[in-house]
């Protein structure tokens, strides 16, 4: 590894920079100033920031402000960054002071040095291509960083949406597979009334569908960008040609239906769009954690718990208890949800803390939001592959639970009244006798009447299902 350095200067002073580095003095200062998380800028964010620099170079060249040779070199350097060829040159921490200036200058320096190299200049000279004058022409950290953030959110949401669509599909399959499995529904963890296991999973599928649609709608929050507004939304140092063409040119590069904000002051100051996206991601995570709590309960045991379903055995569960298997996949999904809830709180506080014309805390918003989206997508993927697809039902045990529960006494209420039904239920719990047995013993109803009234499948039919079944019975 070379120890040679070059001397670079900025408004703070001079500094030795590794001779072969494409980053420069400002990125190096930022690395030294912010040794915070050890997490670098998200690679998708880096790619999108380079897309913006590319669009800016094209737009400035078309406006006659950036010479052809410089523009071509900048575009070529941007393409290399977009392809991931210079990934190690982005050295600043994801969480940094300065509203993202360090990230922006890290990009400007890398592109300037690579573009200058293409034009025959040594790294650090900046004679042909300057980080500020050429790469950052007609831009400010305050419009390129939030725009890159929005593009990154859009890129990251796409695989999450696909994962949720797969999860919804797998849950729907389980709903169909378990439609004839009847178990005891519980409210507040106490026996309630019968429910089909298929209905339980259908409810999960509907929940995931709703979350997926919320996330799809959240896209709209990200399509409006403040690019062209520069520092505070006044578009200072921006030509008319650049102002009106930069967003359409970026739209062509990204494929997203971007539009320039009508109120650039608002779009520069406020981060409510990111708060909204974080909120729907958090909501989805909370919903999935709730489902995973249910899966852990329903699979508990195997002998002294609920034992209604079996989760795939994925790994040994104990270093001391032989044969123990834990519900590790639902557990990790819930932990991801806890993590995301914390991120959402951070994002909320950072958005609230903005002052006057700019929010200085975009870096922590982006760091947390990007991680929330990517970890949730990975959690959904492992939930599908390592849990949902392999779930099986303990049919006999579910049937035994129904037959032994006093909860089915609820079905007697329309026929013998609430008070009498409650007495039957209490007696069943006290004596251990079944509801059916007690009703017959007391001569309250006949066996034939009970066959229909206490039919657990009929108890679980809803709406049209019930009408169709009644019609079939009458026809017989």
What is each of the regions a protein language model found here?
Residues 1-476:
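Conserved, well-structured ligand/cofactor-binding cores
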């Amino acid at each position: 590894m070379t120890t040679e350095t070059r001397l670079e200067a900025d408004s703070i002073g001079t500094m030795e920079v590794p001779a072969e580095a494409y980053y420069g003095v400002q990125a190096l200062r930022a690395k030294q100033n912010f040794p915070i998380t050890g997490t670098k800028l998200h690679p998708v964010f880096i790619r999108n920031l380079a897309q913006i620099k590319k669009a800016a170079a094209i737009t400035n060249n078309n406006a006659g402000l950036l010479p052809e040779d410089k523009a071509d070199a900048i575009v070529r350097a941007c393409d290399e960054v977009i392809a991931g060829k210079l990934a190690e040159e982005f050295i600043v921490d994801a969480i940094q002071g300065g509203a993202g200036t360090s990230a922006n200058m890290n990009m400007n320096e890398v592109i300037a040095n690579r573009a200058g190299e293409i034009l025959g200049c040594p790294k650090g000279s900046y004679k042909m291509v300057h980080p500020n004058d050429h790469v950052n022409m007609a831009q400010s950290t305050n419009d390129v960083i939030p725009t890159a953030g929005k593009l990154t959110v859009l890129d990251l949401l796409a695989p999450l949406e696909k994962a949720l669509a797969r999860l919804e599909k797998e849950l729907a399959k389980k709903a169909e597979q378990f439609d004839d499995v009847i178990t005891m529904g519980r409210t507040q963890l106490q026996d309630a009334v019968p429910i089909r296991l298929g209905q339980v999973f259908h409810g999960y599928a509907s929940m995931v569908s709703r979350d997926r649609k919320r996330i799809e709608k959240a896209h709209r929050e990200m399509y409006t960008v403040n690019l062209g507004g520069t520092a505070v939304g006044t578009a200072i140092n921006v030509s008319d040609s650049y102002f009106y063409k930069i967003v359409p040119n970026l739209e062509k590069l990204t494929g997203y239906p971007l539009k320039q904000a009508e109120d650039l002051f608002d779009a520069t100051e406020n981060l409510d769009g990111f708060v909204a996206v974080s909120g729907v991601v958090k909501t989805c995570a909370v919903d999935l954690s709730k489902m995973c709590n249910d899966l852990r309960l329903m699979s508990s045991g195997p002998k002294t718990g609920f034992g209604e379903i079996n989760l795939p055995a994925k790994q040994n569960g104990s270093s001391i208890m032989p044969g123990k298997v834990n519900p590790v996949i639902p557990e990790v999904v819930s932990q991801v949800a806890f993590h995301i809830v914390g991120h959402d709180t951070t994002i909320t506080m950072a958005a609230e803390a903005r002052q006057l014309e700019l929010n200085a805390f975009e870096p922590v918003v982006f760091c947390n939001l990007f991680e929330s989206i990517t970890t949730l997508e990975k959690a959904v993927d492992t939930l599908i592959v390592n849990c949902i697809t392999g779930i099986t039902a303990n049919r006999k045990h579910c049937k035994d639970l129904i037959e032994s529960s006093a909860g089915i006494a609820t079905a007697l209420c329309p026929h013998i009244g609430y008070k009498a039904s409650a007495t039957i239920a209490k007696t069943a719990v006290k004596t251990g006798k079944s509801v059916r047995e007690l009703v017959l013993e007391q001569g309250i109803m006949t066996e034939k009447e009970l066959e229909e009234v206490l039919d657990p499948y009929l108890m679980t039919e809803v709406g049209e299902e019930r009408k169709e079944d009644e019609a079939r019975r009458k026809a017989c």
